[in-house]
Amino acid sequence: MPAPRAREQPRVPGERQPLLPRGARGPRRWRRAAGAAVLLVEMLERAAFFGVTANLVLYLNSTNFNWTGEQATRAALVFLGASYLLAPVGGWLADVYLGRYRAVALSLLLYLAASGLLPATAFPDGRSSFCGEMPASPLGPACPSAGCPRSSPSPYCAPVLYAGLLLLGLAASSVRSNLTSFGADQVMDLGRDATRRFFNWFYWSINLGAVLSLLVVAFIQQNISFLLGYSIPVGCVGLAFFIFLFATPVFITKPPMGSQVSSMLKLALQNCCPQLWQRHSARDRQCARVLADERSPQPGASPQEDIANFQVLVKILPVMVTLVPYWMVYFQMQSTYVLQGLHLHIPNIFPANPANISVALRAQGSSYTIPEAWLLLANVVVVLILVPLKDRLIDPLLLRCKLLPSALQKMALGMFFGFTSVIVAGVLEMERLHYIHHNETVSQQIGEVLYNAAPLSIWWQIPQYLLIGISEIFASIPGLEFAYSEAPRSMQGAIMGIFFCLSGVGSLLGSSLVALLSLPGGWLHCPKDFGNINNCRMDLYFFLLAGIQAVTALLFVWIAGRYERASQGPASHSRFSRDRG
């Protein structure tokens, strides 16, 4: 009985309620309709996102742009990083100026415009309009000796593509940071169980969109046309925008409530640099003591609440920061794992020739090659199967036996599976290079590019994709749970934004590591092997990632242990006194 009363609190000034029929069942039915609309929008947006990322390395590495494998991998990691790193920007704009509804709508519009760049550059006239003419020869003169230094060719159309990918990353990150909370607002009145189920289905929608995109869009991009393949994500975003606008009458929309970013920065400055803070605030000692914002008297957090929220942030941040190396590992499946797969033997679908030689069959037009991006389905299918199984069967059983691990313990287990994934990838790369160095190769044409691949089947990559999928269940989902549940209500949006931002930091650090190792003398420096990785040492790169993950996993276990002991101590009563909604 008390819970329903708590949810009937006065509405926020400026909050718009949907035009719902009055009645016992009407509101519940329309709340579910609003939640379903959000799930459909998220599914279409994720289908578009994976449609962009699945073959981005292949697209940039193709004859359309002639980027090297290292350059294409770096661009993919930058885009993935931006799509997470910029999440606080969208959340801040929604909190301060736009509100979540308008932030999502405007983000989808930007998404639609930015995603149009990829199909626009997928045909010659469009490329020449945006990028100019490609240089006659992207390769320099041959090296007289194997050890002579030579830099990789400057990537064609890089400024335009990077600008478009960064705008696309900003749009995707803004949708990610606002649509999740906006959807939860729609079902919050139905109770806490409805909110929990919404998040389960929300994660399902993400992966369902990924499945549809990888099955259809990735196949079209690799075997038919990049123009058609990249036009489908544009259509998905357009349909998502239409559905979002069409469902407006059933949405609950809330006005912007302000941001606590300035308060947190002031508190950080006071704690880290007290002398500097005292000089800065000497004109107002009382302001320096209570850290009050220069706000007019309006609803918002009090100075005491700001201090309490800052203390929570200081406790949570070390836990989330130690997840960054996990994200470095996680994003390999959409960058270096793809590049590795392009240099393994990719079988044909419905081959007409028993010899199954890819180049000959492609020349005859008698079959299609299996899209390398389909291996991402191993990750997605694991999530689609194990999430409901874990939610409905495994977790309740462990709970009855009092063996259910905490979110932090699950995250540590997820790091272990991520570690094993890159170890498996490194071992496979060692075996692949063994065949390459003994001149045991097969030539295969993928899209318009000819690759010298090892005779190892691409199916050998399935274990590393399965392991990264299992790690996602134990690290990513509990990470979201931890960030949402440990934050006070007034900072849930900010802390979720920080969580996604740190995910992007992991991707960008992975990109920086690739760039560093691509310098002359680095493991990934192989300019004489244009477009390929056969003279690189990507196996050592994978083992380096595994070592970084192992060290930080041990650090995470220590930090998480301290956090849980502090939560169970005398101060734990304050944890439960915070308003988590």
From Swiss-Prot:
Chain segments carrying region Disordered: 1-26
Glycan-linked positions: 61, 66, 178, 223, 356, 439
A GO MF label: peptide:proton symporter activity
SUPFAM superfamilies: MFS general substrate transporter (SSF103473)
Disulphide bond pairs: none
Subcellular location field: Lysosome membrane; Endosome membrane
Spans traversing the lipid bilayer: 38-58, 76-96, 103-123, 155-175, 200-220, 232-252, 310-330, 369-389, 411-431, 458-478, 497-517, 540-560
Keyword Cell membrane: no
UniProt biased composition (Basic and acidic residues): 1-14
Entry keyword Protein transport: yes
pH dependence: Optimum pH is 5.5.
Gene Ontology BP term (one): protein transport
UniProt function note: Proton-coupled amino-acid transporter that transports free histidine and certain di- and tripeptides, and is involved in innate immune response. Also able to transport carnosine. Involved in the detection of microbial pathogens by toll-like receptors (TLRs) and NOD-like receptors (NLRs), probably by mediating transport of bacterial peptidoglycans across the endolysosomal membrane: catalyzes the transport of certain bacterial peptidoglycans, such as muramyl dipeptide (MDP), the NOD2 ligand.
Full protein name: Solute carrier family 15 member 3
